[in-house]
UniProtKB/Swiss-Prot annotation:
InterPro entries named in the record: NSFL1C_SEP_dom_sf, SEP_domain, Ubiquitin-like_domsf, UBX_dom
Keywords: Ubl conjugation pathway
Pfam families from the UniProt entry: SEP, UBX
Domain SEP: 113-177
Name listed for the protein in its UniProt record: Plant UBX domain-containing protein 3
Domain UBX, chain residue ranges per copy: 224-301
Subunit-structure text: Interacts with CDC48A.
CDD domains given in the database record: UBX_UBXN2
Cellular component GO terms, alphabetical: cytosol
Organism encoding this protein: Arabidopsis thaliana
Family matches, as SUPFAM superfamilies: NSFL1 (p97 ATPase) cofactor p47, SEP domain, Ubiquitin-like
Record region (Disordered): 1-64, 79-98
Amino acid sequence: MSSKDKKLSKPTSGRTGGIRTLSDLNRRSEPDSDSDSDGPQEYFTGGEKSGMLVQDPTKEPKHDDVDEIFNQARQLGAVEGPLEHPSSSRSFTGTGRLLSGESVPTALQQPEPVIHNIIFWSNGFTVDDGPLRKLDDPENASFLDSIRKSECPKELEPVDKRAPVHVNLMRRDEKCPEKEKLKVSFQGVGRTLGGASSSTASSQSNLTDVAAVQSPLQSLVVDETLPSTSIQLRLADGTRMVAKFNNHHTVNDIRGFIEFSRPGNPNNYTLQVMGFPPKPLTDPSQTIEQAGLASSVVIQKF
């Protein structure tokens, strides 16, 4: 993360249940400070390329590890103010044309910021809409160490290195709510009662045909023991969502996730990785690792 910190304006919203900020940590170290505050404050650390918004809950902290993360983020330059996204330039952009008729190329467009939300619960933490992760899991040690250092974890780094990354840190007292399990309707091979059995080769062919028409989402199971990543999806209808995949999942799995979330919509769309210029994803069998899609932004285009 950039070492240049920007101080932002104080939020105007009142105190909300379950949220406490780093200003409360500061008050505990200042005995003369007034106990009545105007409401919650937020702290943002980062500069042109990265940012971190830090919040802390209203009750006394229960987990030393989480306290350490928030305290170190404050010590490494967290400043008061809400997270603000870099405003887009209002200057004219486009292709110019000289009086002689020659075209003048426009300047390179800066990529949009990639935003990730990390919530610390009483029983672990979540990244965006991903599953609950444990603080004492050795596989999460490197991730949490980066947060302590006010750095962007490697798994959240965007494909386009020019894109700024904003990591929002929040803390809640309650346990992470359980997500509803996905129900998948039965799919398989039927056999007519009393019908003649087919040959082994024909049976294998039928099984292959059924497997080919099954929804890609049925096989989309994220294995927490394998390398995984979060991908931000921007759909053609303006919806933005974050989905977690294993690195061995394919472009076709991403399409299956989109089509399951938007049943009935036409599937004659293309996917492309946000960048300049955008990179089309034309090979549905290509894995996320092969396509370099880890922590990327994928756009749906009709």
